[in-house]
Amino acid sequence: MAFLDNPTIILAHIRQSHVTSDDTGMCEMVLIDHDVDLEKIHPPSMPGDSGSEIQGSNGETQGYVYAQSVDITSSWDFGIRRRSNTAQRLERLRKERQNQIKCKNIQWKERNSKQSAQELKSLFEKKSLKEKPPISGKQSILSVRLEQCPLQLNNPFNEYSKFDGKGHVGTTATKKIDVYLPLHSSQDRLLPMTVVTMASARVQDLIGLICWQYTSEGREPKLNDNVSAYCLHIAEDDGEVDTDFPPLDSNEPIHKFGFSTLALVEKYSSPGLTSKESLFVRINAAHGFSLIQVDNTKVTMKEILLKAVKRRKGSQKVSGPQYRLEKQSEPNVAVDLDSTLESQSAWEFCLVRENSSRADGVFEEDSQIDIATVQDMLSSHHYKSFKVSMIHRLRFTTDVQLGISGDKVEIDPVTNQKASTKFWIKQKPISIDSDLLCACDLAEEKSPSHAIFKLTYLSNHDYKHLYFESDAATVNEIVLKVNYILESRASTARADYFAQKQRKLNRRTSFSFQKEKKSGQQ
């Protein structure tokens, strides 16, 4: 029998009733202000008592134990709630339904129609198990590859096959290049050989890869086993080797160059090879001349004419007026284009437009060009820098570095740490394309240590002039180098500049003639 006014019984009943179902722990907070068990152990002391604290034999405060139900026992799985029988049955029914979906029930039916013995025999036909004789005369792909293997093993350029990028397209950086082979016969040299190389390969590795692919395809003639005997030159789309530029540096990576068309040329100056003299044909035109390089004297005059016209028109399409070739010593006599250079017995020709003739004084016969002059003309396209002073109209001269090559002329200011640029205008770098250059003339030569030259170029449909000064030797070298470049290119801007200059001269001459005529009449 329990009394409801007994707080001890009420507290124990609440704790034992909620300990298995209350996850919040609020049952432990019931009657925390009036803990009956703690008050039993430590009764309140009367005021004035000095020994109010009750200590145990060991000097520690005595603990207390809450009342616990006898029915509740602590174990390892005390906090785990077991599944009910209903949940287990539902899980078993779900698995049975899934297994029934996977199974297919077929209802057995008796056969009504009777089939003949021949039809039953055709359902399960007996197969012949006789061994078939092997087919002879047909070669497998493996046998063919094994027969071709010795040819690849004998390739002296096998070490460069690792740079072949045909199997790495899309996964690794590769570069596709069309390579012309001038050492081929006249028919095969017109068609390029496509090579796919790894972008990380050097120029020397690309040369070895070209030689490896050339040998693997069985091309003729055979190549030299030494890769150093060959070099790569820049080539036009039709296979013509551009001799104005030096060959690519063999130690540079191939991804540094953006050319998609190259030519494999043999180094005649390599050890073990005989030297071969370069042959040049001079083609005179209205505003200069061109030097056309040929391999031998067996070349036809038609090929020389095509090269001369292409050199004259540059990147434009070879169309418009037609031209013919004439010997320099035989005016108005056209050269047979089907004949060879050897049969002409001449190395200097004139490029004349059809239905026209050479005017007197247009083509002046120059003296025979020596080999030193030819070398200077060819080396003029190589890059070279000069330190000169740029002359300005309203301010002091500026020290600049003048870089000249076959493509462009660059003017870069030389920075001087001592000179203060706070109160002066800083010179900006200038880049002039060679096709926009018009003239380079010697303006003044006072002494061997001081000379001035003028550089004229086209900028925004207007001709601008730049003046530079340096010692006489440097100025003469610059003027000669720029004029060699201008004579070999024959640009449109240069032709228009000379035409405008001639019109001004004619206008000035006619004006002075009319003035003299009026003064004579008076």
Curated annotation (Swiss-Prot):
Top-rank lineage group of the source organism: Eukaryota
Main location: membrane
Gene Ontology molecular function: any one: phosphatidylinositol-3,4-bisphosphate binding
Record region (Interaction with MAP3K2): 2-184
Keyword tags: Acetylation, Cell membrane, Cytoplasm, Endoplasmic reticulum, Endosome, Golgi apparatus, Lysosome, Membrane, Mitochondrion, Mitochondrion outer membrane, Nucleus, Phosphoprotein, Stress response
Post-translation changes: Phosphorylation at Ser-128 by PKC promotes relocalization to the perinuclear region, where the mTORC2 complex specifically mediates phosphorylation of SGK1. Phosphorylated at Thr-86 by AKT1 or RPS6KB1 in the presence of growth factors; the effect of this phosphorylation is however unclear. According to two studies, phosphorylation at Thr-86 by AKT1 is part of a positive feedback loop that increases mTORC2 activation. According to another study, phosphorylation at Thr-86 and Thr-398 by RPS6KB1 promotes dissociation from the mTORC2 complex, leading to inhibit mTORC2 signaling.
Stated name of the protein: Target of rapamycin complex 2 subunit MAPKAP1
Region (Interaction with NBN): 2-267
Tissue: Ubiquitously expressed, with highest levels in heart and skeletal muscle.
Residues carrying Phosphothreonine: T86, T398
Bridged cysteine pairs (disulfide): none
Entry GO terms, CC: cilium; cytoplasm; cytosol; early endosome; early endosome membrane; endoplasmic reticulum; endoplasmic reticulum membrane; Golgi apparatus
Annotated GO biological process: cellular response to insulin stimulus; cellular response to nutrient levels; cytoskeleton organization; negative regulation of apoptotic process; negative regulation of insulin receptor signaling pathway; negative regulation of Ras protein signal transduction; positive regulation of cell growth; regulation of cellular response to oxidative stress
Classification lineage: Eukaryota, Metazoa, Chordata, Craniata, Vertebrata
Subcellular location: Cell membrane; Endoplasmic reticulum membrane; Early endosome membrane; Late endosome membrane
Activity control: Phosphatidylinositol 3,4,5-trisphosphate (PI(3,4,5)P3) promotes MTOR activation by relieving MAPKAP1/SIN1-mediated inhibition of MTOR that takes place in absence of PI(3,4,5)P3.
Binding of a 1,2-diacyl-sn-glycero-3-phospho-(1D-myo-inositol-3,4,5-trisphosphate), residues: R393, K428, K464
Subunit structure: Component of the mechanistic target of rapamycin complex 2 (mTORC2), consisting in two heterotretramers composed of MTOR, MLST8, RICTOR and MAPKAP1/SIN1. The mTORC2 core complex associates with PRR5/PROTOR1 and/or PRR5L/PROTOR2. Contrary to mTORC1, mTORC2 does not bind to and is not sensitive to FKBP12-rapamycin. Interacts with MAP3K2. Interacts with ATF2. Interacts with MAPK8. Interacts with GTP-bound HRAS and KRAS; inhibiting their activity. Interacts with IFNAR2.
Role this protein plays: Component of the mechanistic target of rapamycin complex 2 (mTORC2), which transduces signals from growth factors to pathways involved in proliferation, cytoskeletal organization, lipogenesis and anabolic output. In response to growth factors, mTORC2 phosphorylates and activates AGC protein kinase family members, including AKT (AKT1, AKT2 and AKT3), PKC (PRKCA, PRKCB and PRKCE) and SGK1. In contrast to mTORC1, mTORC2 is nutrient-insensitive.
